[in-house]
Amino acid sequence: YNRLCIKPRDWIDECDSNEGGERAYFRNGKGGCDSFWICPEDHTGADYYSSYRDCFNACI
């Protein structure tokens, strides 16, 4: 099945960024807005990607 690229709910700070029609989210407490996306894994936690497109390509 297709895994969605999502933000981890417990780390979130939103910045004014929008890539490919999707909102980017950012890790709290990292200083500035370094974007990341996660691709959830059932058994291994999550893979992290710096752009929505990279995440999308890996998840689908």
Curated annotation (Swiss-Prot):
Disulfide bonds join C5-C59, C15-C39, C33-C55. It comes from the Eukaryota. Keywords: Disulfide bond, Protease inhibitor, Serine protease inhibitor. GO terms for molecular function: serine-type endopeptidase inhibitor activity. Residues 5-59 form the BPTI/Kunitz inhibitor domain. The keyword Disulfide bond applies. TAP is a slow, tight-binding inhibitor of blood coagulation, specific for factor Xa. The inhibition of factor Xa seems to be reversible and stoichiometric. This is Tick anticoagulant peptide. It comes from Ornithodoros moubata (Soft tick). The lineage of its organism: Eukaryota, Metazoa, Ecdysozoa, Arthropoda, Chelicerata.
